[in-house]
Amino acid sequence: YLVDLDKNIQVYTKSGSGPSKNVGTGECVIGIGFLHDGITQIIDNGYDNIELIIPSSGTSCEIGATAIFKGAAHPNAAKLWIEYALSPDCVNLAAQNGSYQFLVIDNATQPEVAAEFGLDPENVMDYDFDDATKNIKTYVEEVMNALAASGANTGDENRFQVK
């Protein structure tokens, strides 16, 4: 499937917002990416030529992270920041600042615009994060090897922006 699909792929980007930006600017007609990135292009950048299509089988998701570095100069201040960053008071500011993801913080208010575009926190595919973490290198190598075997120039850094 991916080898056949490759014939229609302009660029593989590691940028989550890249596909929706490319559609918005007219560089391509279809982009596969995260829905919240598409919403950002529509709401914040005014690209009214983007239509979001949500698979009935569920959407993918990403997990943001925050951390305190070992040996941080001010670990107590860092702990206070993380407590605030994970509070409803902070995450409720997300949509006001161009972040339209569904929130996972208890008692946080979901961005209204996300629901208006059809995002549904109950419509998320069953995703095995442990398997993906453990096997990502293998899965990427399998796809890249299959593409190379089909004749795709996987060394083309303009098309395969994955490093």
Kindly label every feature range from the protein language model.
Residues S56:
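Residues at the C-termini of beta-strands that transition into short coil/loop
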Residues I9, I30, N49, Q101-F102, ...:
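Residue-level detector of short coil/turn "hinge" positions at structural boundaries
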Residues T59-S60, G64, F69-D126, R159-F160:
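Mature extracytoplasmic/periplasmic domains
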Residues Y1-I53:
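Ligand-binding pocket segment of bilobal, Venus flytrap-like solute-binding proteins
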Residues D4, G18, N22, E27, ...:
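Extracytoplasmic/secreted proteins, especially bacterial periplasmic and envelope-associated proteins
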Residues T13-S17, G71-N76, P88, F129-K137:
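Soluble non-cytosolic domains of exported or imported proteins
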Residues L119-K163:
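Conserved C-terminal helix/tail region of periplasmic/extracytoplasmic solute-binding proteins
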Residues D6-Q10, G24, C28, A73, ...:
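Sec-exported extracytoplasmic/periplasmic mature domains
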